[in-house]
């Protein structure tokens, strides 16, 4: 197959390229910056996700390389790619992405949390700044530690943890941010593949063992036997179904102080750790064959 991967310079894109290196597939990598990768057959520059011409250029590359399978990995481009796929703008390429409505819910962290809560999926207590009357009200409602993060942002950009109402300046945040109770327990990064048939899910669990909260600090990750974190695996699958997601999904889950897991974020794409779960890409390739 001819496979086009977006964002090949990022962690998610590189993880996929490394897995495809030992296959016979022809891999076309695209990125908004020049990337030197030995394991791809072709490379093309594309505009940033917010460029109105991005989809047109992507569609042109799909035609030029006769792409069979398009795998987007850049969070910012997912809504546009999902819409283009829905409208048939990407020729006959199979696009590895969830339905547009599901992608849009995952793109906005507040919409994600609301949809999961309404579906009975465990999430930490949360709100937006206008839901609270003061910093003290935030801590009274959410607990002894809270986090703030932009509703729309990649990775840990804009993330902050707060432990003191005296030092927390609620007035400096508008409703483009979400405020969540901090889950202090072990952190997991479940990866799920949801197939077209009911009950066709593949789940892999990765544990993050480094407590770092700056965007440049890479956590230490390790694979976990699903049987040893069955509640996390079941929660991840339940979240994917609640959001009506399909294909590969990357989640962030933590345990609350009492030990029960909660969903923090859901990314409707392959994540940076997919090389630890090659069975997910195998499912994608099998489905596209």
Task: Give the ranges of each region predicted by the language model.
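ATP-dependent carboxylate/phosphate-activation module, predominantly the ATP-grasp catalytic core
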Residues: 162, 174-175, 180-244, 255, ...
């Amino acid at each position: 197959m001819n496979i086009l991967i977006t964002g090949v310079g990022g962690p998610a894109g590189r993880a996929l390229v490394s897995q495809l290196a030992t296959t016979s597939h022809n891999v076309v990598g695209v990125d908004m910056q020049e990337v030197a990768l030995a394991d791809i057959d072709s490379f093309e520059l594309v505009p940033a996700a917010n460029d109105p011409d991005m989809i047109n250029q992507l569609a042109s590359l799909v035609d030029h390389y006769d792409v069979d399978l398009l795998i987007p990995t850049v969070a910012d481009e997912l809504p546009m790619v999902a819409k283009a796929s829905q409208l048939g703008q990407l020729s006959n390429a199979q696009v590895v992405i969830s339905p547009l409505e599901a992608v849009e819910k995952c793109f906005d962290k507040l919409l994600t949390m609301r949809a999961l809560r309404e579906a009975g999926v465990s999430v930490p207590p949360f709100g937006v700044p206008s839901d609270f009357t003061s910093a003290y009200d935030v801590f009274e409602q959410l607990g002894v530690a809270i986090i703030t993060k932009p509703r729309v942002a990649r990775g840990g950009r804009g993330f902050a943890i707060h432990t003191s109402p005296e030092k927390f300046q609620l007035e400096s945040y508008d409703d483009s941010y979400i405020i969540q109770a901090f889950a202090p327990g072990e952190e997991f990064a479940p990866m799920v593949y949801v197939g077209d048939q009911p009950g066709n899910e593949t789940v892999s669990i990765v544990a993050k063992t480094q407590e770092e909260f700056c965007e440049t600090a890479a956590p230490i990750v390790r694979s976990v036997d699903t049987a040893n974190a069955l509640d996390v695996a079941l929660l991840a699958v339940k979240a994917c179904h609640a959001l009506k997601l399909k294909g590969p999904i990357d989640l962030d889950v933590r345990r609350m102080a009492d030990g029960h897991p909660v969903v923090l974020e859901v990314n409707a794409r392959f994540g940076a750790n997919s090389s630890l779960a090659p069975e997910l890409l195998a499912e994608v390739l099998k489905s596209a064959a």
